C-alpha cells in the first residue's frame, strides 16, 4: 500500500490542510507528518488522478510538520459557516451575447423545416432523375413504332397516332449518352482542378491498372444497361433493377466482418443478402429473351465499382485486410487517376451506344448532322366519316385565314391564301414534355402507311399548294386533298419573329439525308385529306431532348448536393437513408398510377410531356393484387430488403459535423441512372475512428494509471455513442499488449512537414493510426495578460472555468458511464503575465499588484460556494509558475514573467508557449513519426486575451471547422466589443459591418488575413511547420520589422500560415466578447498600431504573391487583385472623405467650392503639422477638437446630401451608392438577427467618418516611428524601486522600450482589418527631433558612466566584492579619443552585461515565495528536463536584449526614415487625387461622362416675338442628363463593385453559417419520450446531460426557480452524505478525504450482495426535504462543503450514492401518498424534472454502475470503504439538523465545541499511530492481492476483523 499527499484548501484565508491517504482511499492522518521511508519512495500508477499529486520528500523538516499541525488544528476549530450570515450578494448579470428561448425555438423550427426540405428534395430529385432517364430510354425504344397520342391535334377523331421514324428517335440515343456522361465530365473537371492547383499523389502502375480495370468494367456494365436493356424493357421492370446493384458489396460484406459474439448472426444475414442479389440471374421480368442473361451480367459489372467501401481493415481475413489497406492508398491518388479515367469512361459509353443502338437505328441516322434539330412528324387519324373530314378541312382553312390576316392585315380580300400555317395549327408553343401514348402497330397498317407515304411523296413533288378534293372511295388511287405547303426554316423563323403564337407539336421526318430533307420541307403540305383518314404534318421544337437532358442532369446534381448536405449537417438518416429506401417504391407507385391513367385517358400528363413521349407501360392493366403474386416482383422485394441490409451503415452515421466530402464518400462520383443508390453504396461505412473509453485518457492519467486489471481479464467494452443515440452491442476487442494501458494523449510535431515539398495531401483522409486515443482533440488554452483590470480578469477566468466544467461532464460520461462522446476533448489552460514582477527596496523581485489581483479573482471566478485547492508554486528560469487544479479537475498554470530574466511583450509570450507546448512536450517526448503527425493534427492552441469572455459551445464550433479541413491552420470567431460610452457604440457598429462584409468576403473568396489573438484556434501541425513558429521567433532587425512583427503579431502569424499554404477561416456562429477601448486616446493609440501593421502585412503578402498563389490552394490571383484594390482604397480613403466634406459644405451652405475647400483644408493641415512636430498628448487633444468640429459639420452634410438627391434624382449615382450602402447594411443586419442591435449606432458612425477615416490615418502614419503599445500603459513599478534601480529597467527583453518613453501594453481587442471602404489606422507617439538625438545620446552616455560607478560603489559597500580594474577602465575611457571612445563604449556594454548577470545571480529570486499569499502555497521544484529546456530556450530566443546606444540610434533613424517616406507618399497621392478630382469638377462642362439613368426634364417659359410687334410666352422643354467627372464616376463604380462582391460573399457565408448552426442544433422533438426509451438508451442518449446534473452545484451552474430548486434539492442535499469515493476500477483512491466525526451516525447499510455491488448508503429523501425547508433561507450564505476539493469528486460521490428506491419513496411521501410519474414528461425541457430525479434514469445508472464495476475483487472495495468509513465518518451529516431554534442552536454550538475538542485529541492520537496502522493495512491488502482465489476469502475475513477492532478503538 502506498501513500500520497494531497492539498485541500479550506474556505477563507490561511494555509491549506494536508491529508495523507493510502492507495485504497483510507485516511491515516490529517496533517503532514514524516512517513516511513518505504512508504515515501514508491508511487505506482493510480486510476483516480483528478488532483495533482506530490510525492513527499524523503525528509520533512520538523518545523514544517509543526506548522502544518498548527494550521490543521486552527482549521478544525474555525467555524466555516456562520448561521447568522444568511444574506447574499449576487454577482451582476453578465453582459453577454444571449441566445434566448425565442432564438432556440426558432432554431428548432428551422431545423424541422430543413429536415422536411432535405427529405422531399432528395427523394423528389432522385425519382425525377430516374424517371426522366427512363422516358428518354422509352423514346429510343419507340423507333419504327406507330403509337397513339392525345387526340387534341385532330379532335375530329377519338384516336390519333404517329409513326416515330429512326431518324427522329436518334436524338434520344445522344440524349442518353449525354445524361450518363455529364457526371463523369464533372468528375473530370473536379479532378483536373485538384491535380493542377493542389499537391496530390499520383498512382503507381499497379494502382492505376487496378482502378482502370474496375472502372472500365463498371462503365461497360452501365452503358450496356442503358442502351441495351432499358429501351426494350417495361418501365417498372427497369426501375426495379436499381435494387439489384449490390452483388459485389454483398459478397464482400461477410468477408469484412470482425470477430464478435454476433458474428454468426451477421454472417447469416449477409448470406441471405447474397442469395437475394444473386437471384437476378434467374429474373425474367419483361426483358426480351435474347437479353435474358445479360441483365445479371450488367448489374454485376456495375456493382464492382464500390468494392473499396466494403473491405475493412479489421476483417478476420488477411486478404480482406490487405485489400482494405490497398484501397486506402488508392483513395489518396484518386484525383490524378480520374483525370484519365473519366474521359475514358465516356468513350466506353459511346462505344456501348454504337454497339447496342444500331439494330434499331442505323449508323447513318445516329451520325446525322443535327440530331437535336427540328423534325417532321405526321399525325394520322383513321376511320373518319365525311362530316368529320369536312370539319377538319374547315378548321384548317380557318386557321390559314387567321394566319394570313395576322401577317397581312392590309389585304382584305386575298386572291390566294398564303399556306404558311404549320406553326399556327396548335395553340401555344411546344413544351418540353407533350402527351403521347404508345400503341403497337399492326402489320397491315404499317404496310398501308408505307404505301401511302410513297404515293404522297410522289404527289407532293408534282404539285405544291392548292386544294384538290378527292371523291373516290379508293384512297390509294385518287389524289388526296392537301393543305398549304409547309414553310421553310427561314420562313418559320420569320413567322416566329412576327409573334405567331401557334406552334406545331409533333415530330416526323422521312428517311433521307439533309439535302433531301430541305427539299422535302419546302414541298410537304401541312395536311392531307383522304377518303377515310387525314394527315397532319408538323415540326417539333428544336432541342427538346437537350432540355430533358438538362432536367435529368440537374436532378442528379441536386440529389447529390442534398445528400452531401444531409451528411454534413448530421441529417443523414432523413436526408439520405430514408430516400434511398423509399425512392424506388415511390417511383413504382407513381408509374403504376400514371400507366393506369394513361390507359383510360390518352391525354394524361400531356401538359408536361411531348405528345409522342411516354414510358413503356405494361400491356396488361396494373393491379396491386396481381403485382405481388408475380415472381419478378417477389424477387424485387428480396432485392429491396437485401439492399436495406447492405446499406445499413446509412442509419448508423458516426461522422463529425461539417465533414469534408472526401471523409464522407469513397469515390465521389455518381451514376446518372440510379443516383441515390450510387450515393448510398459510395457513402463510407467507417467514417470515424472507433475510440474506446479506456483509450480516452488524459496525459496525467497515463502517467498515474496503468497496468493490467487485477483479475487478469484484458477484455474491454465497446461503448455507446452519445451522438447516435443507439446502443452498440458490447464486443470484446482482440487482445493487445496495450489494452488496458491508457495512452498518453500528448501531441507531437509533424516530421513529414519539415520540407513541405514531399507532404502528401490525402484530402482529409484518416491514415493508419498508432492509437485511437491519439485522434482525441486536445486544446491548450493560452492567455496573455499584462495590466488588465479585475473585471477583465474575472471574465477570462470564468470562461476557462466554463470550459473546465464542460470538459469534466464529457470526461465523466465516458469514464463512468462508458459512453464515448464525439465532441470529447482534453484541455489545459496557461496564463502568461508580462512584467509580473517589480523590485522592492532591496532590489529583489516580487509579484506586482496585477498578480495579486489575478489570484484574488481565481476563487471569485470559480464561484461563491467553493474555493480552489491549494495551488503549487515554483521558481522557474523566467520568473515563477503557479499551478492550480480547477473545480472540475483540469489544470491551470499561471506563468509569471520577470522582464529581467526573459523578454516581455505578447509575441514573446506566444513564442514561449509555442516552444514549450509544441516543441518540448511534442518533439521531445514523442518519437514515433506517424503518432507525431496525428497528434499534431488533433492538438489545437486556443489563444486568448486577458479580457475575453466566451462559452464552450463557441470553442466546439471552431473545432468543427478544424476537423472539417486538415489544411486549416487557424479559425477565428465573431468578436463583440463590450463596454460603455460613445467609442464603444461606434466600435460595435464598426465590428459588425467589418465581420458581416469584409471578413466574410475574405473567407469566401480566399483566406482571412487576420485571426485575432483574443479568440482564435490554431492547429499545432501548422504552427510547427517550416517558416512559421521559427520565423515567428525572429527578432526585429529592420524598421519595417518593428511595424510588421511587433505592432500586429496576430496578423503576422496568419501571414506566415498563408505563405506556408494553410488556410485561415472565420466562423460567424462562434461568439466572443472583449473589452474595447472606451476613451478617445486609447482608441486612437490602438488603431495607431493596427493600421500600419495591417498595411505592412498586406504589402508583404502582395510582394510574395507568386509563392502564395502557388502553395496555397485557397489564394488565387483574383484574391490578390482584390487585396490590392482594397489597399488602394485604404490609401485614397482620406482624400475621398476630404472631397465628400468639401462637396457637402458647398451644397449645404450654397458657397463656392473654393471657399469650402479652404474651410476644410485649414484644420486638416494644422493637424498634419501638429502630428509631425508636437507630442502625442497634443496630437490627441487636437484630434478630439477637430473631430468634434467635423462631427457637427456632418449634420450639414446630411442636409446637403438630401438636397443633392432631390436635385439629381433618385437614379443619380450618388443616390444609388448611398441607398446601396444603406441597403446592404440593413439586409446584412436582417441576416444576423442576434446582432441587429449593432445597426443602431449607424448615425454615430456617420458623424465620426471624418475623424476615423481622415484624421486617424494621418495620425497613424505620422507616428509610424513610435512603436509603443499604447494601451493599458499603467506604471507597474513603484516609484522607490524605479528611482533606486532605474538601471535595471534597461535589462528588459526588447530594444523597443528604449525608443520611446511609454511602457509597453497588451492588446485588449485582437480583431483587426474591418470591412470598410477605407482601412483604419493606429497611433504612435511623437518622434524625437534630429537635433535632440545627439544631445540625448551624450546625456545617456554620461548617465551610464555615473550609473556604473554607483553600482560599483554599492557592491563595495554591501561587501559583495570590488573590482578596481573596472573603475580603472572607466576612468581611462573618459580620456580616449573619439575612436577609442567608441571602442570603450562597446567594452563598457560587455562589462555591463557581465554586471547585469551578476546582479541577477545576487538577486533573491525565491524570496517572493515567502510573501503572502504565496507562502501558503505548496512549493515544488521543476524537473531537470524542463528546467534545462527553459534555460536553453531563453538563452537562444528569449534572452533579454541588452541596451545598445548605437543600435537604438540606428533603429530610430530607420523608423524616422520609414515614417518620412510613407508620409510623403501618402500625402502626395492624396493631394494629387484631390487636385485632379477638383479640377475635373470645375471643368465638368468640357470633360464629363453623361449618366444614362434618370434624365432631368425642365419646362421653361420664353418670350417669343410675334407678328405685329406683339410678344407672347412660349413653353420650352429641355431634357438634360447628369454630367459626371471621369475620376469620380470611376470611383463610384469601383466602390459599387467592391460592395457587390462583399454582399454576395456575405450571402454565401451566411449559408455556411446556417449549415454550421443547423448541424450543431439538437432537435428536441426528434428524441423519443423518456417512457419509450429503454434504460440503456436513456443513459446512452443523455449521458452528458446526466453527468452535468450530477456534478452541478445549485446556485452556481444555473439560476433555478423555486420549483426547480425543490425538484433538484434531493440531488443537491445528497452531496452532504459521505460515501467512499473509490468504487471504480479497483485501483487506488487518490482524493477521498474522510474527516473524523465526534459521534456515531450515518447509515449502516453496506452488506455485500453475492450478485451485485454492495448497496450504497440509502438517503432518506423525505427527511432531507423537510430539513431543506427549514434551512433553505440560510443556504444563500453558506459555502460549499470544502471537503469536496473538486466537483469531479462530488460527481463521483453522487454517482455511487444514487438510489432509485429512495427517490421513489421520497416522491411518494412528498406528494401525499401519490407517486409522481416522472417518466411521463416525455422530453427533456426546462419545465421537466431533471434526468437524475427520473427513477428509470437512476435505475439505469445503478444497473450500468453495477455491471461496469463488478469485476473480480472490485466488488469488495465498496464494502471495505464503508467499513473503514465508520472509523472516520463525515461530520457533515449533522449539518442538516441545525437552525431549528435559537436555544437548540446554542446547545448545538456547545456540543460542537465538545466535538471539536474530541476531534483534536483523536487527531493527535492518529498522528502517532497512523504509520503503524497504515503499515498493517498495507500488509493485509498486500496478502489479499498476492493470494489466490481460495485465500482471498480468508484474507477478507481478517480484514473485516481488523477493521472491526480498529472501529472499536476509534469509538
From Swiss-Prot:
Required for the synthesis of chitin. Gene3D superfamilies: Spore Coat Polysaccharide Biosynthesis Protein SpsA, Chain A (3.90.550.10). This is Chitin synthase. Keywords: Cell membrane, Coiled coil, Glycoprotein, Glycosyltransferase, Membrane, Transferase, Transmembrane, Transmembrane helix. GO terms for cellular component: plasma membrane. The lineage of its organism: Eukaryota, Metazoa, Ecdysozoa, Nematoda, Chromadorea. Residues 513-522, 696-711, 1364-1373 have a biased composition (Acidic residues). Glycans are attached at residues 146, 385, 435, 469, 474, 1274, 1660. May require proteolytic cleavage for activation. Residues 1-108, 190-208, 256-261, 313-337, 566-573, 653-1124, 1176-1179, 1231-1235, 1483-1527 are cytoplasmic. Residues 466-478 have a biased composition (Low complexity). Pfam families: Chitin_synth_2. Residues 130-168, 230-234, 283-291, 359-544, 595-631, 1146-1154, 1201-1209, 1257-1461, 1549-1851 are extracellular. It comes from the Eukaryota. Belongs to the chitin synthase family. Class IV subfamily. It comes from Meloidogyne artiellia. Its main location: membrane. It is found in: Cell membrane.
